[in-house]
């Protein structure tokens, strides 16, 4: 059959072969867009269809020029077109944003997260198109090598002028930093990936200069200097610090449209949270990318772009909370029963100052829900290990990152479902029952921890809201969110980021703190310990009494019950201009500190 197909295509005229290629791309493109529209509800805008189709045709032409054989070119083009379009649609349904260049860096972590048929499918989506590409290229033709050199030189040349190139593309194809889904739909997937790849090149290749850092510090210093923590009494013992980051921990009772048969949260937690003023931490992420929540809670600077900071933003040794506490005599221990290298945690934890990192290999996996170790087992084993360490005379910074609570929220036979709903959403039903057990295991642990370490400082919070279905599906019936980030109200943007926060200040008990952006936690912890820390940890102090939650291309600002969402292309001159200059300065200093030359560490100290 292959030989007959070869004979048939070889006997066709050049015009016929090119006509077949163009017709195939048009038909296949239409089919894939139909699947994307009817299954994922994602499709380019009508005005973008011609340019998107033209980009796909250009890709097919390049492929055919390297092959000259339709029987190899057509399957290769089909595989790439399907993978690019459907993976983008799938990611939008899960996270509300399309595929970005940093997602390719994160692919190894995706493979570590998946198992069984899901892992096999993910590998196939990546491997099959590239395997077909290698088979497609006619390596024996001299013309192929000349074209390859030409294409490589062309790509290299564009990368050398990435700044002007992306500026031109922004002018032609538009760009909205806060609405990446809108970018994809107005450009098409191929143009979107090229445009954002060039932007990634510009962003990663240019770090702030000393003059730019000094100008940014001039904006940030007045707010930071006003923050002066009380010193701990001389000779007072150092208190242990326990930071508990709870996977997908959220107040599911807010799902009022789903008919929950009971409150998923343990009544003991509900009372503890009430004593803490029903405080919330404001997270930079939704449904995943826990590493960004970790970065903020440990390093004191916001994540403002749509990438995993541990992988693409944290390149330097940095004065984060673990390092600051280590210099004060603490033993920093991070515990997370996942694959050690997930989200680059081995390198990231080392760079921010943890002395010890316990991952899945350091725990007995004795109480699994699916592949996730229960919180009860994690708490017990971690405290046993801390209690048996050789340097028990040193205070400990105990950073606990739970794994139980990860989508798709499995429970084992020892944890039967206790809650029913009127909602047929399988993920939602699984999640509310998981929260029933997760909150109870937390409270059982807190009772023991507060008994054994009554003076310890305990900080616990959810890392992000749970994923409850494509397009924020689980939240729609309760009118908490809309299915498109671009259409969310100011209150919805707040809801998208807010998870429970409880801070127990030893014998003083829970503290009412209101809304605390996650990146403000390190300075708050040092304040409660009476440790000043380096000046840099105070630079994220916002102007006035504002709570500012940056998100990609926008930020939420709250002040005494008032709230405003400032979007980059839709700035309100009044409330937004007050914080915009501060945020841009903070981004400059953050890039310098964690990825650049660290000029900020050589700057003059804050004026007291």
Label for each model-derived stretch:
Residues 1-183, 608:
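Transmembrane and membrane-interface helices of multi-pass
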Residues 80, 104-107, 186-191, 210-213, ...:
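Alpha-helix initiation and N-capping motif
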Residues 93-100, 177, 209, 320, ...:
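A diffuse structural propensity rather than consistent per-protein peaks
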Residues 95, 103-111, 123, 191-201, ...:
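Short alpha-helical interface patches
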Residues 101-102, 117, 184-189, 287-288, ...:
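Membrane-interface micro-motifs in multi-pass membrane enzymes
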Residues 111-126, 189-194, 427-435:
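Membrane-interface transmembrane-helix boundary segments in multi-pass integral membrane proteins
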Residues 161-243:
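Membrane-interface segments at or immediately adjacent to transmembrane helices
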Residues 224-232, 236, 243-246, 251-608:
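Solvent-exposed soluble domains appended to multi-pass membrane proteins
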